[in-house]
Amino acid sequence: MKTQKANFLLAKPLLLLFAFCMPGMLAFAGKQIDLLTPKAIGLNKNWVLEKGILSPSKTPGGIIWSKEKFGDFEITLQYKTSAKANSGLFFRSDPKNAVQGGFEIQIASPGIYGGKHVVGSLYDAKEPAVAAGKPDGEWNTMKVTCKGPSIKVVLNGKPVINVDIDDWKEPRKNPDGSKNKFKTALKDLPKTGHFGLQYHGQLVWFQNIKITPLK
């Protein structure tokens, strides 16, 4: 099967355009959108789409971004990691400020990080309720649901995150008193933004990425 490669723009460090959404996509509230179709993915050398699987090419680094912004949504995807992989699903995020401009659910090899950086965590803000990540090389299934300040994550059928972002009232501080990286209180981060998938140097694979905008 002919290999198709996803659009990767390096005009700014770690910036890719993940062209999985068409203009006016927010009008399709309640309808499931398949994010991995040749028509919807911009093609180039840094991400490869082959037989329905999206993965980084040998060119290192980067985040592949959606063109459209989303607010309330449910997204499901499958991923698998290579050894010592570090990746993430960014959402309600700003491609120009990925570190500070939105949220991330950690995707990583089980066991290489702990606490609020372990697989399934709301990165640097909340550790998962249970350990749910599968070993490297096995497909994981993740569902993230955002509705207003509510963020819920289910990993491999296990609820791992169920938070109200309005509880994060102070910059650089979590409700449990621990510190985080965010210069802005999480409750004040935008309620809409882009999706991103991260490549941090070790291979990770994605498939069956589908989003349902919520009314």
Residue ranges and their predicted role:
Residues 2, 23-26:
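Position-driven detector of the extreme protein N-terminus
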Residues 2-15:
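Bacterial N-terminal signal peptides that target proteins for export
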Residues 12-24:
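Bacterial N-terminal signal peptides
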Residues 27-215:
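Carbohydrate-interacting regions of secretory-pathway proteins
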